[in-house]
Amino acid sequence: MKAAAKTQKPKRQEEHANFISWRFALLCGCILLALAFLLGRVAWLQVISPDMLVKEGDMRSLRVQQVSTSRGMITDRSGRPLAVSVPVKAIWADPKEVHDAGGISVGDRWKALANALNIPLDQLSARINANPKGRFIYLARQVNPDMADYIKKLKLPGIHLREESRRYYPSGEVTAHLIGFTNVDSQGIEGVEKSFDKWLTGQPGERIVRKDRYGRVIEDISSTDSQAAHNLALSIDERLQALVYRELNNAVAFNKAESGSAVLVDVNTGEVLAMANSPSYNPNNLSGTPKEAMRNRTITDVFEPGSTVKPMVVMTALQRGVVRENSVLNTIPYRINGHEIKDVARYSELTLTGVLQKSSNVGVSKLALAMPSSALVDTYSRFGLGKATNLGLVGERSGLYPQKQRWSDIERATFSFGYGLMVTPLQLARVYATIGSYGIYRPLSITKVDPPVPGERVFPESIVRTVVHMMESVALPGGGGVKAAIKGYRIAIKTGTAKKVGPDGRYINKYIAYTAGVAPASQPRFALVVVINDPQAGKYYGGAVSAPVFGAIMGGVLRTMNIEPDALTTGDKNEFVINQGEGTGGRS
């Protein structure tokens, strides 16, 4: 028994040792398999396919920062700034960061922020709490640098600053309608700012950085340079623009008019040197400015040109041989289709010069009736009426031009003194620039161009020269535009007055007064159009309302540009047109 027991005990010990060895081997095998799996997984994630983890890490730490570029500067033809970008700051919040730091409290620093932004603390809290998990919300835009520095010193968690720019217009209301303005994101909304938005806008760059949990940049990954914006040099002369606006604004106030517009063009290049409207607005502070006050009336508003087309009627009659330079016309009132054609004052007869000087509707209508109906349509079109002005400005209109096949006699007659078509002030300025260049039609430009600008001849030079000389009589004693006369200079002008058309298409008891012309008449350099809309101070004729403005503006322009006086010296003989009938000074 004892021997058997002794043999069993070693056997059990051997089995127990074998069992422990087997479990140990199994455990080691499992550990090795786990290590192999972990090493394989690590190799897979770190070497074979690391993209997913890298992407996850980048999402948590990489940030793309925009490298902004300033909007291009707008200048006048001599480099004087008309629109510039000034550096400002945007204040923004990271709602998640604010909440992670304990949210908005009633502490002094949060109250200081609310006061600085002029936002009640409860409203500020509501805006940030509207999306607690959000990462971005603007609190204020275009904050001046001093205020931004103050907010930065508050060191509030989740409140950050971003660089941006704000547009500033040094000339303010003087160039408001032409230059326009931008919105808070520096996008052009009106005027040149909108029309040339792509040119003025640069391409922002990008900077990719790695940030730590506190938002600090710890590594620059890459960057893309921004592309600088283009500057824009306009054809405008800021000195002349200020002069035109000042005189126009004074005239609108003096005549209690609804509005006024004026356009000054360089005859030799077609460049627009000044373009003004009154009343204007302050583009640096648009608060309370109605949208209708922002339109550039020189390109958007149309009116019947009235007597300002009469020089073209005389040119056409001379070209077609209907009359000669020294012809005398019977200007006694007459009737057409039951309608009486008459002048403001009664004249028995007038020379061609007298027809322009006295602005005779009878005279030009008889010339028109002596020609085919297509004659005036063709001439007006040659000088640019009915054609787009193509400055590239938003809102430009081409006017309203008749496309008739058949014309009644009364339509032909009224067409000769500016009824039956509608033009913009800019279109009329182009007509007179063509007259001033003695029949050479040049495209208009709002940007600076380098001369020479050849243009296209649309009318014989000799005839246009003759009519320009006739137009000088309008500003001489006995003419309807004598109030436009400029001491020391000869000017060739035409005044006009037209009834306004109401919303229903009928004429109403309101008027538009205008004066258009060129100077100096001996060798024209500038063409100017002045339009006064609905004067209410008692006078409404162009000779009384717009002619004085023309004289004040053109006189200032000639002196500013150092144009040599060309008027006849005292003692030289000056030939005036003598007419039968009473004078009409100040009327037309």
Curated annotation (Swiss-Prot):
Keywords: Carboxypeptidase, Cell cycle, Cell division, Cell inner membrane, Cell membrane, Cell shape, Cell wall biogenesis/degradation, Hydrolase, Membrane, Peptidoglycan synthesis, Protease, Septation, Transmembrane, Transmembrane helix
GO BP field: cell division; cell wall organization; division septum assembly; FtsZ-dependent cytokinesis; peptidoglycan biosynthetic process; proteolysis; regulation of cell shape; response to xenobiotic stimulus
Catalysed transformations (reactions): Preferential cleavage: (Ac)2-L-Lys-D-Ala-|-D-Ala. Also transpeptidation of peptidyl-alanyl moieties that are N-acyl substituents of D-alanine
EC id: 3.4.16.4
Active site: 307
Cited InterPro entries: Bact_Transpept/Beta-Lactamase, Beta-lactam/transpept-like, FtsI_transpept, PBP_dimer, PBP_dimer_sf, PCN-bd_Tpept
Effect of substituting residue 61 to F/P: Impairs recruitment of FtsN to the septal ring
Transmembrane parts of this sequence: 19-39
Domain of life according to the entry: Bacteria
Cytoplasmic face residues: 1-18
Pathway: Cell wall biogenesis; peptidoglycan biosynthesis
Membrane topology listed for this record: Single-pass membrane protein
Residues that make up the propeptide removed upon maturation: 578-588
Pfam family, one: Transpeptidase
GO MF, one example: penicillin binding
Listed GO CC annotations: cell division site; divisome complex; plasma membrane
Segments on the Periplasmic side according to the record's topology features: 40-577
Activity regulation summary: Inhibited by beta-lactam antibiotics such as penicillin, moenomycin, macarbomycin, furazlocillin and piperacillin. Antibiotics inhibit the activity by binding to the catalytic serine.
Subcellular location: Cell inner membrane
Family membership noted in the UniProt record: Belongs to the transpeptidase family. FtsI subfamily.
Listed PANTHER family: PEPTIDOGLYCAN D,D-TRANSPEPTIDASE (PTHR30627), PEPTIDOGLYCAN D,D-TRANSPEPTIDASE FTSI (PTHR30627:SF1)
Protein role: Essential cell division protein that catalyzes cross-linking of the peptidoglycan cell wall at the division septum. Required for localization of FtsN.
The protein's assembly and partners: Homodimer. Forms a complex with FtsW. Interacts with FtsQ.
Record remark on domains: Contains an N-terminal membrane anchor-containing module, a central non-catalytic domain and a C-terminal penicillin-binding (PB) catalytic domain. The transmembrane region is essential for localization to the septal ring, interaction with FtsW and cell septation.
NCBIfam families the record matches: PRK15105.1
Protein name, per record: Peptidoglycan D,D-transpeptidase FtsI
Lineage: Bacteria, Pseudomonadati, Pseudomonadota, Gammaproteobacteria, Enterobacterales
Gene that this sequence comes from: ftsI
